[in-house]
């Protein structure tokens, strides 16, 4: 478990104090991994992230003209791994396999809750020179298959 509280500010022309472009207010992260009881070849992992949004300004305008923050970043990933072969198994003693310690196969579900996090904004300007922020979203839920060979 990791918890951070952050504050990065700058003063512009000795009159306006604004957040730095990378100033997230908070970040909470969790990573948990464990074996299934009685099944040392099966591991489950869980990762969660909650982070405050970054400050954004419109193009051709500065922080003095105002800013807003992106929505908070939220994500939960879930993974399951199975050990195909370990160093003590007979198959791992022959040929090229003798160079390996373990072989794992796994499946992950990234962003299991399918949360639409904002990555940036596309700015649209109307005929009256008003600018509107249109969000660009990160990828939703993804399925990942993996094969890990430990040397």
What are these regions (language model features)?
Residues 50-59, 82-151:
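C-terminal beta-signal and adjacent terminal beta-strands/loops
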Residues 1-57:
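Gram-negative outer-membrane beta-barrel transporters
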Residues 11-19, 62-68, 130-135:
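Extracellular loop and loop/strand-boundary signature of outer-membrane beta-barrel proteins
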Residues 6, 40-42, 46-49, 77, ...:
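A general secondary-structure boundary signal
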Residues 22-28, 72-76, 101, 139-143:
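Residues that define the transmembrane beta-barrel architecture of outer-membrane proteins
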Residues 38-77, 90:
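Extracytoplasmic gating/loop element in the C-terminal half of outer-membrane beta-barrel translocons
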């Amino acid at each position: 478990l990791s918890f951070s509280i952050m504050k990065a500010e700058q003063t512009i022309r000795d009159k306006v104090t604004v957040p730095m472009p990378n100033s997230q207010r908070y970040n909470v992260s969790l990573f948990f991994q464990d074996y299934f009881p009685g099944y040392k070849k099966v591991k489950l992992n869980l990762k969660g992230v909650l982070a405050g949004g970054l400050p954004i300004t419109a193009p051709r305008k500065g922080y003095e003209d105002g800013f807003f923050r992106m929505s908070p970043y939220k994500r939960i990933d879930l993974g399951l791994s199975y050990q195909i072969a370990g160093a003590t198994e007979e198959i791992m003693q022959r040929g090229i396999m003798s160079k390996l310690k373990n072989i794992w196969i796994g499946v992950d579900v990234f962003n299991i809750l399918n949360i639409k996090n904002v990555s940036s904004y596309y700015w649209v300007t109307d005929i009256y020179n008003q600018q509107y922020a249109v969000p660009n979203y990160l990828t939703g839920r993804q399925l990942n298959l993996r094969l890990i060979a430990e040397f």
